[in-house]
């Protein structure tokens, strides 16, 4: 049997993503050495499991993610345990 080590990521919520928690951040547990793509997948599962009746379904695919240094990060960005990552949903308007 293989033991999988996990890490915790703090996801700082902005805009419509604030509907996911009554706090400023959401704690997400991921396997060690996960990247942003895996964070998106985990967030999609959380939304489908807990918020299936909301309109947040496209949030993980369409949102931008930012590092602690406020740099836009892509899906290959390697996450670190206890890292603070910000999620910025798309903003519409006209």
List the predicted regions and their residue ranges.
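Ubiquitin-like/PB1-type beta-grasp interaction modules and other compact soluble beta-rich domains
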Residues: 2-93
């Amino acid at each position: 049997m293989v033991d999988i080590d996990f890490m915790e990521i703090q996801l700082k919520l902005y805009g419509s993503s604030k509907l996911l928690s009554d706090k400023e951040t959401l704690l997400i547990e991921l396997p060690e050495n996960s990247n942003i793509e895996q964070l998106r997948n985990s967030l999609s599962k959380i939304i489908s499991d807990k918020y299936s009746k909301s309109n947040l379904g496209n949030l993980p695919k369409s949102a931008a993610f930012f590092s602690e240094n406020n740099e836009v990060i892509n899906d290959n960005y390697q996450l670190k345990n206890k890292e603070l990552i910000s999620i910025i949903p798309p903003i519409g308007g006209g």
